[in-house]
Amino acid sequence: MLTRSDIHQKSRRWVVKIGSALLTNDGRGLNKDAMAQWVSQMVTLRQQGIELVIVSSGSVAEGMQRLGWSQRPSELNELQAAAAVGQMGLVQAYESEFAKNGIHTAQILMTHDDLSNRARYLNASNTIQTLLEHGVVPVINENDTVVTDEIRFGDNDTLAALTANLVSADVLVILTDQNGLYNDNPRTNPNAELISEAQVSRKDIEAMASSEGGSLGKGGMYTKVMAAKRAARSGTATFIASGREDNVLPRLLAGEPLGTLLIPDLEPLTAKKRWLAGHLQAKGQLVLDEGAVKALQSSGKSLLPIGVKGMSGEFQRGEMVVCVNENNQEVARGLVNYPFFETQKIMGHPSSEINQLLGYSDGEFLIHCDNLVLAD
């Protein structure tokens, strides 16, 4: 378990997410002076042996400036156009600043669909690993130009967490315009107290997180806490800290008590189960009876058709489904062995009847335990 006191000694790979409010002139294009300061801090980390992956916002705000737009558009095609124009300036700014220190950068644009495909997921992981081995700093952003609502990450906090899983990062730093996670909303309660350190499984941290975001970005504090939970699947510790603090990254590395540190306190998932838990979009839902829920949660067993009481969605064999209890609470998710219409025929029946019901059998399990991940 990585704590604040041993961050310097034990962490070697960081994912740093920088929000649009910290990179732009209040939405009017990139703040080149601010970007130079961020790169300077990251160069300092590099000099202390830290491998860096950057997840950077700012392309839409830069595109708005270049196109002469004063308000963030709401239509997807206009957002995509702004992102396409602005991404050019964003990458140029990073490349220029890192080049002053003899460091190469690489642009990587991804969609959720890229990570949902196991082969492409592994290819992305291998590519980033190779870049890091060659001393290159990858700059990652969502591929807004081609993305649709169905394959969006939704915000760069989520993208940063999934990137941390992808590269098995030791530390995820989410930089924001707030000091960290408070026990209440500091914008409305002046007596709210900063949470310096907490275990990521702590039950009340989601309730503490404000869901209010700024006008330029999309992610509020709630998305940052959920990102920390996702990052914890790979054993990654998460800092949520203010980007307004001077020299914040080297100071976090030195162990200074800045921001909020959310510590992963559960056993990390295997690489395959991290992919299952974080990178696939659910195509359907199975409602389980009480016996099936207990079998999954207490015994780590596979899911049998007899334990399914209801279902919804439309899925094919091998696609992700969410398993819920009778109160609609998520229990697990996994890759289903039978498509929707066949699952509909065999649910509630013992596995010995599958061949009779379908005319063939592809195994006794609806979801094998190797392809199933329990809910946090």
From Swiss-Prot:
Q: Which SMART domains match?
A: PUA
GO biological process entries: L-proline biosynthetic process
GO molecular-function annotation terms? ATP binding; glutamate 5-kinase activity; RNA binding
Q: Which reaction does it catalyse?
A: L-glutamate + ATP = L-glutamyl 5-phosphate + ADP
Which InterPro entries does this UniProt record tie to the protein? AceGlu_kinase-like_sf (IPR036393), Asp/Glu/Uridylate_kinase (IPR001048), G5K_ProB (IPR041739), Glu/AcGlu_kinase (IPR001057), Glu_5kinase (IPR011529), Glu_5kinase/COase_Synthase (IPR005715), Glutamate_5-kinase_CS (IPR019797), PUA (IPR002478)
Q: What PANTHER family would the database entry show?
A: GLUTAMATE 5-KINASE (PTHR43654), ISOPENTENYL PHOSPHATE KINASE (PTHR43654:SF1)
Q: What is this protein called?
A: Glutamate 5-kinase
The species is: Hydrogenovibrio crunogenus (strain DSM 25203 / XCL-2) (Thiomicrospira crunogena)
Q: Which gene encodes it?
A: proB
